[in-house]
Amino acid sequence: MGELAPITKIIPVLVVTAFMVIGMMLHQTARQKQILGVLWLQAMRRLITHLQRHRGLSAGVLGGEQALEENLSEVRKQVFKDIDAINGVGEWMNQHADWLSIVEHWTRLIGSMHRLSVSDAIHQHTLLIKNVLALVDEIAVEHHLHDVPGGSQWRDLLTLAEYVGQMRALGTAIATVANHQDEIAVNKTREDLQELSQEILTSLDSPNYRAGIDGDNLQRILDFLSYVDAQLLKDAPGVEASGFYAEATKTLDQLFKRFDQQLSQVHQRLAH
């Protein structure tokens, strides 16, 4: 019995050590899963950016602004590269039904673009982006990113960016269609622009949105709304399609820059 005493003392220590090791391994596995989620979000952000650009350029080209055709072709190629990059992050996405549906929707959209009206093209792009944003939310939940401090403020930036992205497409359409004297289309699109402008202002009144946006971006958005009001909502549009598209893109690029900063901070917290 005396020989067993040292062993019986060691066993509890070994058990505790084993549990500690298992706990550390589980924690590390969970952390790796969160980091993988961040990588997917970063890739999805690039896809959203290019889908939004494609929507705006399509609105111009289908409305008759052929000067935007070359840019549209380049952005289209970039979307396909984004899809390949997302597929390369991991197997989870390759087998995800919603992701496969998004890719299929994009392929159908490209194949039918030449037959779509401006409004239908904008609608299809917006529906596609809405589905990508829903998948972004699922990625965040599935990979427990909301458990990370500051791990959800970036999401409101995507919502704001999509509002601005829709305004870019509608504004480009107005500036293009106006050149062809389609007053009915211009008036309808103006109403849509006014609704989006109000959506943005309402969102900016929310403390959650204010927490994630910096002062420079807040002012930039407000300035952009004033620009839209002055150039597109007063009498005849006072800006060309390419000029409006470029101005809206500046606002969007800064919002996405802020998004990248916030997601980078999440990644840094997980990596240390």
Where do the model's predicted regions map?
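Hydrophobic alpha-helical segments
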Residues: 2-272
